Amino acid sequence: MLLTLIILLPVVSKFSFVSLSAPQHWSCPEGTLAGNGNSTCVGPAPFLIFSHGNSIFRIDTEGTNYEQLVVDAGVSVIMDFHYNEKRIYWVDLERQLLQRVFLNGSRQERVCNIEKNVSGMAINWINEEVIWSNQQEGIITVTDMKGNNSHILLSALKYPANVAVDPVERFIFWSSEVAGSLYRADLDGVGVKALLETSEKITAVSLDVLDKRLFWIQYNREGSNSLICSCDYDGGSVHISKHPTQHNLFAMSLFGDRIFYSTWKMKTIWIANKHTGKDMVRINLHSSFVPLGELKVVHPLAQPKAEDDTWEPEQKLCKLRKGNCSSTVCGQDLQSHLCMCAEGYALSRDRKYCEDVNECAFWNHGCTLGCKNTPGSYYCTCPVGFVLLPDGKRCHQLVSCPRNVSECSHDCVLTSEGPLCFCPEGSVLERDGKTCSGCSSPDNGGCSQLCVPLSPVSWECDCFPGYDLQLDEKSCAASGPQPFLLFANSQDIRHMHFDGTDYGTLLSQQMGMVYALDHDPVENKIYFAHTALKWIERANMDGSQRERLIEEGVDVPEGLAVDWIGRRFYWTDRGKSLIGRSDLNGKRSKIITKENISQPRGIAVHPMAKRLFWTDTGINPRIESSSLQGLGRLVIASSDLIWPSGITIDFLTDKLYWCDAKQSVIEMANLDGSKRRRLTQNDVGHPFAVAVFEDYVWFSDWAMPSVMRVNKRTGKDRVRLQGSMLKPSSLVVVHPLAKPGADPCLYQNGGCEHICKKRLGTAWCSCREGFMKASDGKTCLALDGHQLLAGGEVDLKNQVTPLDILSKTRVSEDNITESQHMLVAEIMVSDQDDCAPVGCSMYARCISEGEDATCQCLKGFAGDGKLCSDIDECEMGVPVCPPASSKCINTEGGYVCRCSEGYQGDGIHCLDIDECQLGEHSCGENASCTNTEGGYTCMCAGRLSEPGLICPDSTPPPHLREDDHHYSVRNSDSECPLSHDGYCLHDGVCMYIEALDKYACNCVVGYIGERCQYRDLKWWELRHAGHGQQQKVIVVAVCVVVLVMLLLLSLWGAHYYRTQKLLSKNPKNPYEESSRDVRSRRPADTEDGMSSCPQPWFVVIKEHQDLKNGGQPVAGEDGQAADGSMQPTSWRQEPQLCGMGTEQGCWIPVSSDKGSCPQVMERSFHMPSYGTQTLEGGVEKPHSLLSANPLWQQRALDPPHQMELTQ
């Protein structure tokens, strides 16, 4: 009995309820388990095959590996699959053919011709038969897998439409679409039984072979409403559920707890819980006008083997992995049950062994120069200087092609047939004749992890420990619990499986704005940082036990990384331009990097390499690395970056991945920055954060709020997961292998009661001798003597089994879901959907109803759906924040409550802090502290209180409120508090302005801005703008000066014009008339007067001798006169006698004889004049303009001197 119990417990445990700590997985085939109490199968993941138009496609349940298997399958396709054969069978109604193809799309072939009016088909995978129904003829026909031995199984039926088979129970089911009935019969064609009848229409039938239930789609006669119904194999326990798709259902298939179905109008595949219709996921395929057709889920558990296998042990030799016959090289004949050897092997004489055939020894290999035998095969070889041609048989001498000829990925050889591409050893040429594939080629032989060479032309794929090779024999999937995503959604934290299932909210209350998030696999806790509340928290994976770790010195934390081995966490603060570190409990926090860092955002830690990696989105964007202490900094990338945001590490390959939000690119490189390349660009929206696991890179998109993934090597196979998201930020993959090296047994013994052992990152519990493991896989039950003597029976009446947990939890889950908004994830294989032309706001969700789509603003936003604005809940008075002890902070799409100064709590429940008892006051030694609500008061000791009195040796802190003999304190710091440490950037000094109740920064030279955030280019741009204003002023001033000069020139021109006009009237002397006027006013003047000179002219007054008797001196040599006096040696113009009309000047005679001129002897100076008159006594008399000058008068009375005035 004890043995039976031990065997049954794992079987029962597979029905346990799925939670975050025990994610859901498919049941295990043939009882093979892997892992601990939350075990899952070691086997392939399920995938879907479906008909669409005249083609057959396949796609994973996660939306990946979407490919076309059959191109021309026919217009109307009815299909099923045979898992053991790895084949798809379908009926082409147009050509009346039964055809088949392998699951990978290869070797399409015809099976047999088939009659018209086939309405349904199913595969009997145990008896190796194909069964189909003919609605017009009212018959069901059966044939073998090769199309032979066809015969009618059932006849005289009422319009048999859909067919389903359970060969394990040996039942065949079909529906009558016209009559609305369901029937059952044995596979032998006997025992026909009507299960139920309905007045409505039945369109599709499918079986749940594990739970032994029949499912069908039921329509009302108007076709306006569709339901999914089920019953047991006897027609009892009928269950009806309405799936909220608002579309008519067409085809369906079941697997595990999920139901997959398609609709008529929508080009989508829906996934939902088969019991409740909830946990819905929609796979949105490429836009098409043709609806989806048949739909099947492919997995070995969908076609289980019969349990009553009665073969003898000697007839099962081919099933053994060890022994007489290896399962890797032999199969089993269905008739004789004896071993059959694979190609390249021959059966041994005792017919129990498969022996290798040496093809090289029989000379039937076809190699031209060399042959080498391998187990089950062989390959051709070539000597040095020769290369193996693409046919794998012939060798050719190596003659390289010209460079302009070769387009080969490896190298090219010239042959008589022309240039041919060839590949290195370990690779082969692809079908395009240019690309190489293999372990020695860049594609790694198509293997997602390990490529193992078997020969120079063959290889096989393998996986790292903890990963399983999938059905395609190339990709690897992590074993153990099903991985899922955690992501910060700005105002909450959500979780979701890779296929969109289990989509829900983990934390939503008092979140504010959360961009930073990470997971600790050892204690199974999440760490996250608030940018609105400005602190860092942690909580359990179920959202309980929230703890504040860092509350002081945090401003804008946008990146966070947990060192799960070193037991620390690191964060980036973009507001304070630093990187901090702390123990996981929040103790011993310190700043490790602050110098030469501008705006750090994303951060990742590599515990094995002991390195930190982060992105900097500042003026000089770059990717940097340092030791865990902040030393040994290294720039990974600095070119071609604009706004590098998220960063992550692939620990399997030691590759670094990051995203650039402004360039919309995903890039990768080695840990040292080498071999950098772009993985994808232009189709990733606005990526914010990035994560990597298995074969895919995940990243969050703000442009179309969603989570996306692409292949981590090629950048292809893009899939989008969306569903009522706001701003998905940090991404974390939760799985034991996502962070290798973690030891869950270090924390609380891994949850095990007795013994804990680490197995691939998970805790494996076992019990000591005398105990047995309970159903939870962690606790141990004592086996006392009474139990052993009684046969080891254990009373499980009071034990809570997983089935009890399932039922109770589902009831509570249903109650919660009814009161909350149900999140529905959508897998977008293509961005072309019905919502694309609507243009919804990024803060709205699209609701598709048939061919119409509308936009609805998300919670916390208001608008018409195309334009949604944030609702200020604080202004509207919606929040529940207690006004006396907390304040409301509005955030994007929500709000948070934060306790006021003097209080502590979660923002909604705030308690007063006793500053006096804690010593957090500044009353001084001569004052006593009294705690008050939200603050404290200081009272002077030993003296009477007076208004305005301050205690001696005590300085009142800021924000004091004087009230007679005491003052009340709200904030005892005179400078900026610790919460604003680092508020001012680039060495700026923080100041608190009490009058304005605001903080300000005193910036150093070269930095400006509210927080001294502008420098270098930004600062110079502002300065350049100021210089530009100055230059504008200078330009205006110059223009004014030019205008003034032009005005002066115009005046001068006018004056010049007037002078020329006077000259034209009196060309000899224009000033003669004025001279006459002067002479008429001077009667003492001589009658003849003086000969006037035109203006300008010279008035020359020099020292001279009085030449009596009219005698003229004779000039001597070297400018001396006849009397020895000096004569001028240079003149502007030769002196001329007066009266000759010269325009440059004239000589003025001053002798007793008329017309004679004085003798010039010495210095001269220029001065304007308008005429002269002769004075008596031999001295010139100046013009009235000159005589008015006292200096001139003095000089005029001095006989020995004369003056020369020149213009």
Curated annotation (Swiss-Prot):
PTM section of the record: O-glycosylated with core 1-like and core 2-like glycans. It is uncertain if Ser-954 or Thr-955 is O-glycosylated. The modification here shows glycan heterogeneity: HexHexNAc (major) and Hex2HexNAc2 (minor).
Gene Ontology cellular-component terms listed: clathrin-coated endocytic vesicle membrane; extracellular exosome; extracellular region; extracellular space; lysosomal membrane; plasma membrane; platelet alpha granule lumen
Membrane topology: Single-pass type I membrane protein
Gene Ontology biological-process entries: angiogenesis; branching morphogenesis of an epithelial tube; cerebellar granule cell precursor proliferation; epidermal growth factor receptor signaling pathway; epithelial cell proliferation; ERBB2-EGFR signaling pathway; ERK1 and ERK2 cascade; mammary gland alveolus development
Result after altering residue 1070 to L: In HOMG4; affects basolateral sorting of pro-EGF preventing the hormone to stimulate EGFR; lack of TRPM6 activation
Gene3D superfamilies linked to this entry: Laminin, TolB, C-terminal domain
Cytoplasmic side: 1054-1207
Reported tissue expression: Expressed in kidney, salivary gland, cerebrum and prostate.
Swiss-Prot/TrEMBL keywords: Disease variant, Disulfide bond, EGF-like domain, Glycoprotein, Growth factor, Membrane, Primary hypomagnesemia, Repeat, Signal, Transmembrane, Transmembrane helix
Disease field: Hypomagnesemia 4: A disorder characterized by massive renal hypomagnesemia and normal levels of serum calcium and calcium excretion. Clinical features include seizures, mild-to moderate psychomotor retardation, and brisk tendon reflexes.
Listed name of the protein: Pro-epidermal growth factor
Organism per entry: Homo sapiens (Human)
The organism's taxonomic lineage, starting at the top: Eukaryota, Metazoa, Chordata, Craniata, Vertebrata
